[in-house]
Amino acid sequence: MSADSHAASSVEIESKYDVDDTTPLPDWSALPGVVSVGAAEPRDLDARYVDTPAADLARAGIAVRRRTGGPDAGWHVKGPLDGAGRTETHWPLDDDTSTAPGADLVVPPAVQDAVAAHAAPPFIPLARLRNDRTAYALLDADGEQVAEFVDDHVRARDERRGAESAWREWEVELGPAGPADEQGRAAFFAAVDAAVFAAGGRPAASGSKLARALGH
C-alpha cells in the first residue's frame, strides 16, 4: 500500500447463515424488489487477520485483515456492530507485498493509524481464511443491485493454536438499491430468512468467519 492510498468506508448490513455441503441454493423470487439473479461470479479469497499479543482489537470488537481476490482486495478494518451494521474501512493493496512467499504480514501505517485508539504494534498473525466464494447479484427491475448473495466454502486456520476447520455458509448483504429505511430492511431480511430456511439453511452460530475460525 502506498503512503498516499485513500481509504473508503461503508456500512455493511447483512445476514449470515450456516448450511450443509449439500444444501441447495435458495429461491429468491419472493424477495421484495428482486426480479432477477445475476450470473454466478466465482471468487478465490485469501484473508489474513492480525491482532496484538494481548488481543486488544478483539476486545474492542475490531477485525483487521489483508485480503486478496475479489473486487475489494486490500486491507480492511471492520468496526463493532453498531445498530444495523458494521462500518468497514478499506485500503487498496497498491504496491504492498506483504503476502509474497515467506514475507511477514506488515500492517501499513494508515491501517495502524485507523486502530490507534484501541491497539498499537506489534501485530501478530491471528488467523488465515481461504474462501471459495460464489457471488450472485440480486437485481431490481432496473438491473440495480438490491443485495448480494454469496455462497462460501471456507477453510480456516487459527494461527495461535494451529487448529484448522472448514465449513460452508451463506451471506446476504444489502446493496446500493436495497431498502434504506428500517422497516423496509426488516421486511427484506424477513423474506431472506424465509427463503434460506426453506432451502435448509439456519442462523449462523458465529457472528463472523473470524470468530468461527477462533472457535467462538
Task: Enumerate the language-model features and the residues they cover.
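Phosphate-end processing signature that detects enzymes handling 5′-triphosphorylated RNA
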Residues: M1-H216
